[in-house]
């Protein structure tokens, strides 16, 4: 969405309702500004006359907020995001921290943005497709801005020794296939890096000599 310069003297020539429910303001300069109808109504700005500095500033702020929210919804349409992730991406594109914060609050209130839902989907995907242990998953969630309390609560739903042992054994077999010679100490270290507990690693390596820790 191209950035439109809105300054004192700008004139709104025409207002068009869009199929999305938004409106397009056609400016005399040839530029187009998009807003939500309720926002435009609240601004109560005149048409066909030049806006003064205060009016132009109000329109510019509203247009900036609309652009932030539009980009946020576009990103969320591609995949779930944590609040932290979405804030970081918006900060790369926009220089208005207040507009970004207001946008995130609005999206959370309307249910478009949810750290809990993001974390649930993240865990579902990781557990279905990767052989990582719970400590690795906990760290990855925290790296994405999820609180430790929420991450641990959701991971507790997968608190199954059988699940983690199965994943550790698959990870072990993959490591052994890739390396011609792997000693027990190295194998233990690699599985530890994948986020498995000592007890799970010991069970997965039960047929091998145990390393001295």
Q: Predicted regions span which residues?
A:
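An alpha-helical, amphipathic repeat domain used for nucleic-acid recognition
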Residues: 1-213
């Amino acid at each position: 969405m191209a950035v439109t310069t809105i300054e004192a003297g700008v004139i709104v020539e025409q207002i068009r309702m869009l199929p999305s429910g938004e409106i397009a303001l056609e400016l005399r300069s040839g530029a187009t500004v998009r807003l939500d109808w309720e926002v435009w109504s609240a601004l109560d700005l005149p048409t066909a006359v030049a806006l003064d500095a205060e009016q132009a500033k109000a329109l510019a702020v509203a247009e900036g907020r609309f652009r932030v929210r539009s980009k946020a919804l576009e990103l969320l349409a591609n995949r779930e995001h944590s609040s932290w992730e979405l804030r970081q991406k918006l900060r790369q594109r926009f220089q208005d921290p207040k507009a970004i914060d207001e946008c995130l609050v609005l999206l959370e209130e309307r249910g478009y943005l949810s750290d809990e839902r993001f974390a649930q989907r993240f865990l579902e995907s990781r557990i279905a497709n990767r052989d990582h242990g719970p400590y690795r998953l906990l760290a990855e969630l925290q790296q994405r801005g999820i609180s430790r309390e929420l991450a641990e609560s959701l991971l507790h739903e997968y608190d199954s020794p059988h699940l983690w042992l199965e994943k550790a054994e698959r990870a072990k077999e993959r490591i052994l296939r890739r390396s011609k010679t792997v000693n027990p100490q190295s194998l233990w270290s690699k599985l530890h890096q994948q986020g498995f507990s000592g007890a799970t690693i010991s069970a997965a390596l039960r047929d091998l000599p145990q390393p001295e820790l």
